[in-house]
Amino acid sequence: MSDNDELQQIAHLRREYTKGGLRRRDLPADPLTLFERWLSQACEAKLADPTAMVVATVDEHDQPYQRIVLLKHYDEKGMVFYTNLGSRKAHQIENNPRVSLLFPWHTLERQVMVIGKAERLSTLEVMKYFHSRPRDSQIGAWVSKQSSRISARGILESKFLELKQKFQQGEVPLPSFWGGFRVSLEQIEFWQGGEHRLHDRFLYQRENDAWKIDRLAP
């Protein structure tokens, strides 16, 4: 098969979106109410990693980067995730705290995008979550100098075994280079697939202490 033939096959991959629409009259005043409903439905549908979200950041050269992390908490203050503070994303957030999040719930023909500003969590918040993680995950946080180059996986595995022995007694301490971010809720867009590509999109935009809701063309 030539490259052109393969491209033609990819170009014809499509499906119809038939799971239902989203109407203005059905929208709650608070976007978190709708987000919670959709997240609950994603969990009930047994989607793989329903809390997985794409975090988009920009570096000092205006180059965008994306990666998938897990949502660990949300409320009216924002959406929370945790990471190595020496990671690429953490450095980029330090340089430019404006980020976007995307929840891609393909099976439900839905996606949610959040735009806001990321800020560091307090040490108390981070410590509380860190010690709720499985012990091996706590040790794993110590192992990796995230985004650095390594020659082989064996380096990580050896370090893990070394630290597992070191921390076999008592609590695993919180690494100073591990933390979390809360992304404020400035804009939240809900997308529901529709027939004939007439998708439903609604944008919640914060204005003072209220939310303005607009329908967007697909």
Curated annotation (Swiss-Prot):
Cofactor: FMN
EC annotation from Swiss-Prot or TrEMBL: 1.4.3.5
Keywords for the protein's UniProt record, in alphabetical order: Flavoprotein, FMN, Oxidoreductase, Pyridoxine biosynthesis
Gene Ontology MF term list: FMN binding; pyridoxamine phosphate oxidase activity
Residue numbers binding substrate: R14, R15, E16, Y17, K72, Y129, R133, S137, R197, L198, H199
InterPro entries: Pyridox_Oxase, Pyridox_Oxase_CS, Pyridox_Oxase_N, Pyridoxamine_oxidase_dimer_C, Split_barrel_FMN-bd
Binding site residues for FMN: 67-72, 82-83, 88-89, 111, 146-147, 191, 201
One annotated GO biological process: pyridoxine biosynthetic process
Gene3D superfamilies: Electron Transport, Fmn-binding Protein, Chain A (2.30.110.10)
Catalysed reactions listed for this entry: pyridoxamine 5'-phosphate + O2 + H2O = pyridoxal 5'-phosphate + H2O2 + NH4(+); pyridoxine 5'-phosphate + O2 = pyridoxal 5'-phosphate + H2O2
Record's cofactor remark: Binds 1 FMN per subunit.
SUPFAM superfamilies cross-referenced by the UniProt entry: FMN-binding split barrel
Pfam families to which the protein is assigned, alphabetical: PNP_phzG_C (PF10590), PNPOx_N (PF01243)
Pathway entry: Cofactor metabolism; pyridoxal 5'-phosphate salvage; pyridoxal 5'-phosphate from pyridoxamine 5'-phosphate: step 1/1; Cofactor metabolism; pyridoxal 5'-phosphate salvage; pyridoxal 5'-phosphate from pyridoxine 5'-phosphate: step 1/1
Keyword Transmembrane in annotation: no
Protein family membership: Belongs to the pyridoxamine 5'-phosphate oxidase family.
Function of the molecule: Catalyzes the oxidation of either pyridoxine 5'-phosphate (PNP) or pyridoxamine 5'-phosphate (PMP) into pyridoxal 5'-phosphate (PLP).
Self-association state and partner proteins as the record states: Homodimer.
PANTHER family: PYRIDOXINE-5'-PHOSPHATE OXIDASE, PYRIDOXINE-5-PHOSPHATE OXIDASE
Protein name, as recorded: Pyridoxine/pyridoxamine 5'-phosphate oxidase
The organism of origin for this protein: Escherichia coli O1:K1 / APEC
